[in-house]
């Protein structure tokens, strides 16, 4: 699996799955609003129907139906903003890996707040998320194991408020 940090906009990602996060109780970020607008409101509508709050472990997914360069967008909950470090980062990024496996996505972009030490935690979460102990399993030719080949990490603000602070 190739993992790299990218400076480009998540809107330019052309792979299988784009994952973005929202902190618990936070308003949608400018990126989330842009994506929802590009998807004709599908992302925000599905998040509202699912009562998405950004709590750790929550997620909603929508197909882009050709409206974006990527095939699918998944919004994951990052948990409380003040606890976004260490284990919370690993768990969220492991959720990215599991989402990729569930979608059978080979190329994934994760637009998450990854500044500083969070980048190390993100890499660890990716490795833990894709790990499978298959030594004792018999091979199933009809369902070969999923392989995540590329993960592009894009650093984004944790919340709209954090984005405004960074811009000031």
Question: For the regions a protein language model found, what residue spans apply to each?
Answer:
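Short amphipathic alpha-helical segment within the helicase RecA-like ATPase core
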Residues: 1-168
